[in-house]
Amino acid sequence: MLHRNKIHESPPMAPSNGTRAMLDSRPNDNLPRGTICIEDLEIGLSRHLRKEVTDRDIELFAEVSTDRNPVHLDDDYARDTIFEGRIAHGMLTAGLISAVIGEQLPGHGTIYMGQSLKFLAPVRPGDVVLAEVTVREIDYPKRRVTLDCRCTVGNTTVLKGEALVLAPSRKFD
């Protein structure tokens, strides 16, 4: 069993190599990955990651989820929709929020209790998504943490919402 220090670091993953991500001065994500226990969380603590959504990501998500809606996969079909082109699955974008929560804040050992999301704009193949999570409320006795969640593409918010999680605690090591 791992002992959780203030932040237990895991080896970093390779950053996204999308060219648009390189144009921005912010790093792909703020490391370390691992666990921040409930005892060490503070209101306003924030983590993020940046990912270019590729055609391959969309195809793999369609395969895993079995959501093969042609608006995600068929250029000709998608051109005739209100989106005027293919878009990524909304839940693929939401999955980036899950990655921040499960890998960084609070990180490993976190249990999802609920999430509400609003999808505000489409994400297209080639878009670079910034997924951000910020601690809004902490119920220390119950180990419950409410997180504000947001995804942006450039200056456009494409997704916003909140998540309720059960954070790991050192006293259960």
PLM feature spans:
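Short, intrinsically disordered/low-complexity patches at protein termini
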Residues: V71-L73, F83-E84, I111-Y112, L117-K118, ...
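Hot-dog-fold acyl-thioester-processing enzymes
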Residues: L2, I7, P15-T110, F172-D173
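Well-ordered beta-strand positions in beta-sheet-rich domains
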Residues: H48-R50, S116, K160-L164
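HotDog/MaoC-like acyl-thioester-processing domains
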Residues: L2, I7, P11-D29, R33-I43, ...
